[in-house]
């Protein structure tokens, strides 16, 4: 039919126009979409479907009592009253803060995990009430570079804490920085009383630091605020790589037993706020022999007498002590607050007069001896008659003895008297 024939071509043209419009729209969408959202021409349909259906990998779990940041690779478990190290620490952790908890004991293998915490580099365990750290407590941490055990009252620090639990094999520790500030236990928790307990505590710390070859790579060591009286003789012998040593705010009265000769890389030594009174020539010579060291000595009670002369001369010539201009005398009273660099040889004398306390002691002793002497004389006076009679008896006895002696001598001297004596005897 004519009508049907006329509608056919117009309908076909309409469908063709719609198809062209659809192709144009599809091309515009393809051009505006990101190239990464479309599969490449070399990707098969099966691969495209697989990639479209794949899910992102699940995030690592975070312990319930902690805060985790995978981007910063940091885990913080702060003030959570934890009794032990969380078991489900994420393996990506590089910085771990376990502070302000209630972990009194840190046993061997406390950080052993599967998979291991191979990237853990910074570990802060300060303020956890730790009393005991076992041998090999930090094993299985091959990347550990900084360890902070400050503000824990350690009564039992194993000699193999940093060396590993296998005591027959000395395993080098990866540690570069070790912070042990204020780890001294309270006085009532020290063994064998106060002084003996301090000596035992110093020996315990020294044993942990010199265990085998464990810490020979250590660069930074802090031992501030531990009430040390003396440094153990071999405390620093196994730390040849040490660059920074912090001993401030202790009670050090002398460095006689310490040796710094082996610390050839030492750059800074902090001895502020101790009880040092004078430094001897042996210590000064060791410091002068270290090429790069800087020693800080402020806030010590220096005694400015004749024993200080060598130290004052050394201070005036050396550049080892950056704060030498701030060093002042604490004793004797007449020299208080005078700068060490301002002293001359005439100022540094040993006063022959005794200290006031010693003078008082001698006066008291003299009074006691005088009283004893007075009592003795009084006893003699009260017994003067008896003493006089006793002396008369002694005199009479001596006289009788001497008369008998003279009589026998006269008889023996005269032969006639001798014969007479013999005949009379017969």
Swiss-Prot record:
Keywords: Cell membrane, Disulfide bond, Glycoprotein, Leucine-rich repeat, Membrane, Phosphoprotein, Repeat, Signal, Transmembrane, Transmembrane helix. One of its GO terms (cellular component) is dendrite. LRR repeats lie at residues 92-113, 116-139, 141-163, 172-210, 215-238, 239-261, 262-281. The keyword Membrane applies. Highly glycosylated. Residues 53-91 form the LRRNT domain. Glycans are attached at residues 124, 166, 281. InterPro entries: Cys-rich_flank_reg_C (IPR000483), Leu-rich_rpt (IPR001611), Leu-rich_rpt_typical-subtyp (IPR003591), LRR_dom_sf (IPR032675), LRRNT (IPR000372), Wnt_signaling_inhibitor (IPR052286). The keyword Zinc does not apply. The C-terminus of LRR N-terminal cap (LRRNT) and LRR 1 are essential for the inhibition of the Wnt signaling pathway. This is Trophoblast glycoprotein. It comes from Rattus norvegicus (Rat). The gene is Tpbg.
């Amino acid at each position: 039919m004519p009508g049907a024939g006329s509608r056919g071509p117009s309908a076909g043209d309409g469908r063709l126009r719609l198809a062209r419009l659809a192709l144009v729209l599809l091309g515009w969408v393809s051009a505006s979409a990101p190239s990464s959202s479309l599969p490449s021409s070399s990707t098969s349909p099966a691969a495209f479907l697989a990639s479209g259906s794949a899910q992102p990998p699940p995030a690592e779990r975070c312990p319930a009592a902690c805060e985790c940041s995978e981007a910063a690779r940091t885990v913080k478990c702060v003030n959570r009253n934890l009794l032990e190290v969380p078991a489900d620490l994420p393996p990506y952790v590089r910085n771990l803060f376990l502070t302000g908890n209630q972990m009194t004991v840190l046993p061997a293998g406390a950080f052993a995990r599967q998979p291991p915490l191979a990237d853990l580099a910074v570990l802060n365990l300060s303020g956890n009430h730790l009393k005991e750290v076992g041998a090999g407590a930090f094993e299985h941490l091959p990347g550990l570079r900084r360890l902070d055990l400050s503000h824990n009252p350690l009564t039992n620090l194993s000699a193999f804490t940093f060396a590993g639990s296998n005591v027959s094999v000395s395993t080098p520790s990866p540690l570069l920085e070790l912070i042990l500030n204020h780890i001294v236990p309270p006085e009532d928790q020290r063994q064998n009383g106060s002084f003996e307990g301090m000596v035992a505590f110093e020996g315990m710390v020294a044993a942990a630091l010199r265990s085998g070859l464990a810490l020979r790579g250590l660069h930074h060591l802090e031992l501030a605020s531990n009430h040390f009286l003396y440094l153990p003789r071999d405390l620093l012998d196994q730390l040849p790589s040490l660059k920074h040593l912090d001993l401030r705010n202790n009670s050090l009265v002398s460095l006689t037993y310490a040796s710094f000769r082996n610390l050839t890389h030492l750059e800074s030594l902090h001895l502020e706020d101790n009880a040092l009174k004078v430094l001897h020539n042996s210590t000064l010579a060791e410091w002068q022999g270290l090429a790069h060291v800087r020693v800080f000595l402020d806030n010590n009670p220096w005694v400015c007498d004749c024993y200080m002369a060598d130290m004052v001369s050394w201070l005036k010539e050396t550049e080892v002590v950056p704060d030498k201009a701030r060093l002042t005398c604490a004793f004797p009273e007449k020299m208080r607050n005078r700068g060490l660099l301002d002293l001359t040889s005439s100022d540094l004398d040993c006063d022959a007069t005794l200290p006031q306390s010693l003078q008082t002691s001698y006066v008291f002793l003299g009074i006691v001896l005088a009283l004893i002497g007075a009592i003795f004389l009084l006893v003699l006076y009260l017994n003067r008659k008896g003493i006089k009679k006793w002396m008369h008896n002694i005199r009479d006895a001596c006289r009788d003895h001497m008369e008998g002696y003279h009589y026998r001598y006269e008889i023996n001297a005269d032969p006639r008297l001798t014969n007479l004596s013999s005949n009379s005897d017969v």
